[in-house]
Amino acid sequence: MKIIFATNNAHKLKEVQAVLGDGFTLVTPREYGVTEEIPEEQETLEGNASQKAHYLHDRTGCDCFADDTGLEVEALGGAPGVHSARYATDGHDFAANNRLLLRNLEGVANRRARFRTVISLILGGEERLFEGIVEGRIIDRETGHEGFGFDPLFVPDGYDRTFAEMTTEE
């Protein structure tokens, strides 16, 4: 089954394709002529995922899905949350985001955090929302080279390595 995934992020595309396996072929918006940046203007992960999926579906008429993920840190009242990609700057500057997160957690004992992802899937014109949560903690320095974003700082519960140290299969 071919489905449009609302991302032009090569890392994310690779990760999701590996999870979905051979039964699905992910294609990018560009492959369907959607070259502009897809808007993310909502104040919730659910709102952003839904907005992106509907934007693609309205322009292509094809089955599609979109996600929005936020890192929610307990000691920061759930921040950066929906603003994770633009935590430190208006752009997607992962290094700046990680530096700001570490600065904001200096001297803070409670490092509990979670990644929360919301997926909006539109099949046959009908939308379904899904949510996934990974609980964990933030360490005090970046470790690992895989993944992207906050992955070098996040250790999921039950592991002693960051997401950036794990393989896609893990």
Stretches with model-predicted labels:
Residues K2-I4, A10-E170:
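Anionic-ligand binding patches
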